[in-house]
Regions:
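Structural motif
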Residues: 88-90, 129, 154-156
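Small-aliphatic-rich amphipathic alpha-helix that forms the alpha element of a beta-alpha
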Residues: 33, 91, 97-145
Length: 174
């Protein structure tokens, strides 16, 4: 698949199935991520790979967060608790702000966003699908703290990863 076809044909599948990429495949994906534009070579992007038992740990964190929401319904609480199990692997996108006179915080976030796009395009080229999720679970200080992130670190989203599932449903853009 050439680069332009990869860009034009990538979409987010609604159905996420096993398997996840191998460790060797993920090393290539991370190399591609780090080729994203990075003003002043600050390296603001890092990635937490969640799979296997890690999905349960992330589920526990999401459920703990849900319990802090006043008057949360059981349905929404279960939705948060089950969110990590939608795919066999999740990459948590972390942006680390570093003080720099010429590189404001927004440019550092844009670098991490570009890294995320490189991740998704790399996975697509390897016949995997990726869905970038944000919402209340991203940009969330409670979850960041429970993941052990520092004050200058922020979650920019979660990339859910699975085998590229080919069906009419997979062709729908999410």
């Amino acid at each position: 698949m050439d680069a332009l076809d990869n860009i034009l044909n990538r979409n987010s599948a609604r159905i996420l199935k096993n398997p996840a990429p191998s460790n060797d495949e993920m090393q290539i994906v991370y190399q591609a991520a780090l080729r994203a534009p990075d003003h002043a070579w600050l390296r603001p992007s890092s990635f937490i790979e969640v799979k296997d038992e890690g999905l349960q740990k992330l589920s526990n964190i999401f459920e703990s967060y849900a319990l802090t929401i006043p008057n949360i319904s059981n349905v929404i609480q279960e939705k948060y608790k089950n969110a990590p199990f939608r795919a066999p692997m999740i990459i948590i996108l972390v942006n680390t702000f570093k003080e720099h006179p010429k590189v404001p915080a927004i440019e550092q976030k844009l670098s991490t966003a570009a890294a995320a796009q490189n991740i998704m395009l790399s996975l697509n080229a390897m016949n995997y699908s990726a869905v970038w999720r944000t919402g209340k679970l991203a940009f969330n200080p409670f979850i960041a703290k429970h993941l052990g992130l520092l004050e200058n670190q922020e979650i920019l989203g979660y990339i859910y990863i699975c085998l590229l599932y080919t069906s009419d449903a997979a062709d729908e853009v999410v």
